[in-house]
Amino acid sequence: MKIGILALQGDVEEHRYALEKAAAELGLSVKVVEVKNAQDLADISTLILTGGESTTIGKLAKAKGLEDNIKKATLPILATCAGLIYLAKEAVDRRVGKTRQSLLGLLDVSVVRNAFGRQRESFQTELEVRGFGKVNAVFIRAPAVVKIGPSVEPLASLRHVDYGEVYAAVRQGSVLATAFHPELTTTAFHKWLIREAKR
């Protein structure tokens, strides 16, 4: 089984480690492929969109011809933090409002970038995530999902001082996205991705 990690920017190694650990815990073997161009998408079973900086990820993916190929691939996807933003149908920035950044539009959600503030406002909290139980969630310059479409299932929410209840984890079919970084604290989400790949 080959699992791809979009490796243009962000926490690629943390996801690789979480994937390999998750596979070992399941008694399975996975090959992790760093996806840096369209050819790297061939033969992968699933894809991870990492955290990092969503505008940079989008620009690089477009420049390398990855964006259209990811849209066409219909792969199970795990997206975290900036990956969630890049996957969204709509994104605005907390400070500057509308942005012209490139988005995949594969997840029917509206996202506010940097919703919880900048780096110094990063935090950790315990969240109850439907289907995953209690998760130690690390939010780093985290986005927030403020609106979901009818086909999107909310998995975890928390209160935001400006936006009220916001979503920190959502699922739409075989696409799972989190505003936090599960790769830093748990293998549960990577196990989900491996199981999706086996379907």
UniProtKB/Swiss-Prot annotation:
- What CDD domains does its record include? GATase1_PB
Kindly list the positions annotated as binding L-glutamine. G52, E53, S54, R113, I140, R141
NCBIfam families to which the protein is assigned, alphabetical: PLP_synth_Pdx2 (TIGR03800)
Q: What does this protein do?
A: Catalyzes the hydrolysis of glutamine to glutamate and ammonia as part of the biosynthesis of pyridoxal 5'-phosphate. The resulting ammonia molecule is channeled to the active site of PdxS.
Protein name, UniProt field: Pyridoxal 5'-phosphate synthase subunit PdxT
Key words of the record = Glutamine amidotransferase, Hydrolase, Lyase, Pyridoxal phosphate
Annotated GO CC locations = cytosol; glutaminase complex
What is the native source organism of this protein? Pyrobaculum calidifontis (strain DSM 21063 / JCM 11548 / VA1)
- Write out the similarity annotation: Belongs to the glutaminase PdxT/SNO family.
Q: Does the keyword Transmembrane apply?
A: no
Its quaternary organisation is: In the presence of PdxS, forms a dodecamer of heterodimers. Only shows activity in the heterodimer.
- A Pfam match is SNO
